[in-house]
């Protein structure tokens, strides 16, 4: 019997054909003969105590001019699907949380949800990394300016960032003697009402912020180094960085081995680790990317490896 795979994502018509990781996953699933069903966040709902969706059958194509075709909308229980990929991009807001509640109902009805809804709620992408202090640069989370100032005085060169940012937004570098620290803290903490993260600056960022993809707790053999544009301290592609695929180093594999068992335990089947130099900086659990860039550089099939892992999970049930 064919696997019925649903996906919750941002509008498929607006994705970047060349870079979109969700499309890579869908192409891999379709190549296995699986049936695809498309949903956007607003299509999820609950009726008569059951999680449901207005979903549409989906076909995908390796064609930059026409990469998808949608069928007629149908109203169905999520329990009729075998697996659901939650690929809605941040922001991680209350609407995202409500979506995880609905997906958790589907999970309780026997659907495999990738990634596990509870873990999507629990694992803030910046805070999650602090569970592995042996892997991270000196890090502080606080909303009190005096505590943050003590940290910046100790480390002299630091990165300050919100806990809920994405794509490199609102990330500041502060160095000793910079007169702008007060306004940076006022802005990021919203006058002391919001927790933020401070990390000791890593000079290795000039060589790239590496995205290491993890499938069921095991690393893909290659990563994508996102190298900052001239004059930048952020490697994010959304902030103008350029991507360069590379093999993993021994240190990368060590970090992956430290984190992998926890990912498996939490049902986080597809995850992106962010590593600068020798240090883990973030663990991305909501809609990680960079599949297409690594596949293009090394002729890998990361989407296929993910579908293999999903297939194993389904058969083990």
From Swiss-Prot:
Pathway: Sulfur metabolism; glutathione biosynthesis; glutathione from L-cysteine and L-glutamate: step 2/2. GO terms for cellular component: cytoplasm. Keywords: ATP-binding, Glutathione biosynthesis, Ligase, Magnesium, Manganese, Metal-binding, Nucleotide-binding. Its EC number is 6.3.2.3. Binds 1 Mg(2+) or Mn(2+) ion per subunit. ATP binds at residues 152-208. It comes from the Bacteria. Mg(2+) binds at residues 282, 284. Residues 125-311 form the ATP-grasp domain. Its cofactor is Mg(2+); Mn(2+). The keyword Transmembrane helix does not apply. Coiled coil: none annotated. Belongs to the prokaryotic GSH synthase family. This is Glutathione synthetase. It comes from Pseudomonas putida (strain ATCC 47054 / DSM 6125 / CFBP 8728 / NCIMB 11950 / KT2440). The gene is gshB.
